[in-house]
């Protein structure tokens, strides 16, 4: 029986990492928001690894934070280990990673959502969309409730027609023992939304009391109080170590002997799996010459015995999982609490979306997270906050927000999805960002806080802290330019001690800091009256000075790139009328409908010659429009319409 559930500005379907950010962004900007989810006890669930961050992913977390999102704050409050990765490499690829207490992570996020003004949570299963004249009107739930809205964000994760596979057993289900959702997939097809079928997997969870940590290498976190959030600080929870061990010949033999029972190799798994997070059986087959693979035993929380076996995702039968785990040092008597499994699920082809994450044909319908073909909590959160912002902007009649590739990893992620599409679960990598030297995790606030403030997600107090930080950075850089060291015995000894050449003439501290061997901290020897500045400020000063030349070159590249981005393509352009385009280019341009020449240039199969033809055609359109405007102006003058 039909039941009226109410009217809302914004409805978000799904309360995973994308849905949480979308709902919070919409509500905080001022939209009356409803968040619908299959299970209110599984909000912000971490069904795979118990961690946030890592290479490229930490960049996204800090960008979400800079925009005014919640993920960074949530992990800062619930982490049980922090480690800065790639510290021996340059700042562009350094990445913060934190182990999470999964239960506390969920509890805190649920608390934040429940106490957010303008936001209401309900446990419901959405089966249908209400669409009239290509405009979203609301949703219909499994129990027949009708909820109406102006804008809708779908963040359904891996639940659509989810199928769990362990060996020769498979059944309907979502991740971590949850139920699957079936209605929406069929409804999407009814509305012409193209679907794909992807697969992902997870390792077994094992009993702590069955592990022998003496046979493993202990890995402690960093003592330095790292945090993801620029605008939030909290006391750390008790910190726990992780443990490193390795597979071996016996492990590999068991896996090879059991491949006939692997659903991955028997053809029982049809969905496409992630290239950058392969199962252990896939690793053994693809890299037969590798004698061992590293595994990390990661705690899932302070008050649980469950440990996550990172690096050993599998869908092999349970008996095989047990036998192969027991060949590993430290796991000889291991007990499995939850077996590893593969999950197949429906997702949409993301090329159907605009850069705002709104559907190209259905107004008011947004998609974010794994439904768009991505993998990872962080990638989901990045999409979620942008979808929520744009839904709220549309409700208020404001311009949409598009994050450029030169502005953030979120921009790279979304541009890749909607421009190129993906044939496998998309994972963010630093190598995907062509401007990674200026898209570092340490400067996410400098890049995106202004935008977060403009849309209403950054509070006034935090914005003033941000402005003060900018002032401190610029002031200190100018001060360093004003202080010179004159070559003398003391200075030359200092240079020699730091394995760098001596000075030949008076040189400013600013230019001395450009030397890779000299740190800002080391210069205190000659600069005892310097101001007391926090690490986040001195870090920026040092990076900006040391990499100034490289950064300037990348800024020039961005400026050239933005010229192509500024060449907008009319929405009503008919590519069949452009002579000189290749057949493939014409078909792809007609399908993807890029908004700019820059975006067209990134579509696979579009050659430089096609771009040249397109630019000539756009110039002809512009000249024709200019002539028509001039003719119209002359006509008005002759008829006296412009007289006072």
From Swiss-Prot:
InterPro entries: FAD/NAD-bd_sf, GIDA_C_N, MnmG, MnmG-rel, MnmG-rel_CS, MnmG_C, MnmG_C_subdom, MnmG_C_subdom_sf. Coiled coil: none annotated. SMART domains: GIDA_assoc_3 (SM01228). Keywords: Cytoplasm, FAD, Flavoprotein, NAD, tRNA processing. SUPFAM superfamilies: FAD/NAD(P)-binding domain. GO terms for cellular component: cytosol. GO terms for biological process: tRNA methylation; tRNA wobble uridine modification. The keyword Cytoplasm applies. Its cofactor is FAD. FAD binds at residues 14-19. Residues 625-644 are annotated as: Disordered. Its main location: cytoplasm. GO terms for molecular function: flavin adenine dinucleotide binding. NAD(+) binds at residues 273-287. Transmembrane segments: none annotated. It is found in: Cytoplasm. Residues 625-635 have a biased composition (Basic and acidic residues). NAD-binding protein involved in the addition of a carboxymethylaminomethyl (cmnm) group at the wobble position (U34) of certain tRNAs, forming tRNA-cmnm(5)s(2)U34. NCBIfam families: mnmG_gidA (TIGR00136). Homodimer. Heterotetramer of two MnmE and two MnmG subunits. Belongs to the MnmG family. This is tRNA uridine 5-carboxymethylaminomethyl modification enzyme MnmG.
């Amino acid at each position: 029986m039909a039941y009226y559930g109410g009217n809302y500005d914004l409805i978000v379907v799904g309360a995973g990492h994308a849905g949480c950010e979308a709902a919070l962004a919409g509500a905080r900007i001022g939209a009356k928001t409803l968040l619908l989810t299959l299970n209110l006890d599984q909000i912000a669930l971490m069904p795979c690894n118990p961690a946030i961050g890592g290479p490229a992913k930490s960049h996204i977390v800090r960008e979400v934070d800079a925009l005014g999102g919640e993920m960074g704050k949530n992990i800062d409050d619930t982490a049980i280990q922090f480690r800065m990765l790639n510290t021996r490499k340059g700042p562009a690829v350094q990445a913060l990673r934190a182990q999470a207490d999964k239960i506390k992570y969920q509890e805190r996020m649920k608390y934040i959502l429940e106490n957010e003004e303008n936001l209401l949570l309900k446990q419901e299963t959405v089966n249908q969309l209400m669409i009239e004249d290509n405009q979203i009107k609301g949703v219909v739930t499994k129990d027949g409730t009708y909820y109406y809205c102006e804008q809708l964000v779908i963040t359904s994760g891996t639940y659509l027609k989810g199928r769990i596979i362990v060996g020769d057993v498979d059944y309907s289900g979502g991740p971590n023992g949850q139920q699957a959702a079936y209605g929406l997939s069929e409804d999407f097809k009814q509305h012409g939304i193209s679907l794909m079928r992807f697969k992902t997997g997870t390792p077994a969870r094992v009993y702590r009391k069955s592990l022998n940590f003496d046979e493993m290498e202990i890995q402690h976190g960093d003592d330095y109080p790292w945090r993801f959030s620029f605008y939030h600080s909290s006391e750390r929870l008790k910190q726990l170590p992780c443990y490193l061990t390795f597979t071996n010949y016996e492990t590999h033999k068991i896996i090879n002997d059991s491949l006939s029972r692997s659903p991955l190799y028997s053809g029982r798994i049809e969905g496409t799996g992630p290239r950058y997070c392969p199962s252990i059986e896939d690793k053994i087959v693809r890299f037969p010459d590798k004698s061992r693979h590293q595994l990390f035993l990661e705690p899932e929380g302070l008050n649980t015995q469950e440990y996550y076996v990172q690096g050993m995702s599998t869908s092999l039968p349970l008996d095989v999982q047990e036998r192969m785990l027991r060949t590993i040092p430290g796991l000889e008597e291991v007990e499995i609490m939850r077996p590893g499994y593969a999950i197949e699920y429906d997702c949409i082809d993301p090329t159907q979306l605009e850069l705002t994450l709104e559907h190209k044909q259905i107004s008011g319908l947004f998609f974010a997270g794994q439904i768009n073909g991505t993998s990872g909590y962080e990638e989901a959160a990045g999409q979620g906050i942008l979808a929520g912002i744009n839904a709220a902007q549309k409700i208020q009649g404001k311009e949409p927000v598009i994050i450029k590739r030169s502005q953030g990893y979120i921009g790279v992620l979304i541009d890749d999805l909607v421009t190129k599409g993906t044939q496998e679960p998309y994972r963010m990598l630093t190598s995907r960002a062509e401007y990674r030297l200026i898209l570092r995790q340490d400067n996410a606030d400098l890049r995106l806080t202004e935008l977060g403030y403009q849309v209403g997600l950054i509070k006034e107090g935090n914005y003033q802290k941000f402005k003060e930080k900018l002032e401190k950075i610029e002031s200190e850089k100018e001060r360093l330019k004003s202080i010179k060291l004159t070559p003398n015995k003391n200075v030359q000894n200092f240079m020699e001690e730091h394995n760098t050449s001596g000075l030949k003439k008076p040189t400013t501290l600013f230019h001395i800091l450009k030397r890779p061997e000299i740190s800002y901290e080391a210069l205190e020897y000659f600069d005892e009256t310097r101001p007391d500045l926090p690490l986040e400020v001195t870090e920026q000063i040092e990076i900006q000075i040391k990499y100034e030349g490289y950064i300037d070159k990348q800024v020039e590249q961005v400026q050239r790139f933005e010229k192509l981005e500024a060449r907008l393509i009319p929405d009503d352009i008919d590519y069949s009328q452009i002579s000189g385009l290749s057949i493939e280019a014409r078909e792809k341009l007609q399908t993807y409908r890029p908004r700019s020449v820059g975006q067209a240039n990134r579509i696979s199969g579009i050659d430089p010659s096609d771009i040249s033809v397109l630019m000539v055609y756009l110039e002809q359109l512009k000249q024709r429009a200019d002539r028509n405007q001039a003719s119209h102006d002359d006509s008005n003058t002759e008829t006296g319409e412009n007289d006072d």
